[in-house]
Amino acid sequence: DVIRAQAYTNDIRIDASQSVPVSSSLIRKLLHQGDVDIAARCLGYEYFLDGTVVGGYQVGRKIGFPTANLSVDDPDKLIPADGVYAVWVTFDGKTYMGMLNIGVRPTINNGPNRTIEVNILHFHSDIYDKFIRLTFVKRTRPELKYDSIDQLITQLHKDAEETETILFAAKRR
């Protein structure tokens, strides 16, 4: 009922044609599945993670896709499913397009450690220790293991193109 009241107040349409009640359990399930775009429609806003940029292993930089590694400030914040996402990256009052990976980086042999790392498209400055917000738009694919770094690089180029297409269509407000 709270979600419906907020939707009414903010002039957001909730499609109840499937007779599925919108609940916090449903939102959590959608996020665990990586369905961030559907979760956003249910919430009435895009899901986001806030955190601080921390040092990583510099692997992304070495293969032409430098990443900002996020340490999430809220330990109780739900991290969506592993995979690649089109996101908005906001810091210092500016918003940029980002290609986000959540997962264990299986091609790099990261072990069991789950990371949250974003390649900020067309951006080449140092942002270590900066507070950033990642706003999820759409999951583009699950995290996959490739047979070689070259195959990974080829896929990352495709991912970057798809991310730009999605974000240009989304037109950040």
For each predicted feature, which ranges?
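Classical nucleotidyltransferase
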Residues: 1-66, 147-156, 164
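Phosphate/ribose-recognition catalytic cores of enzymes acting on nucleotide-derived substrates
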Residues: 12-15, 56-173
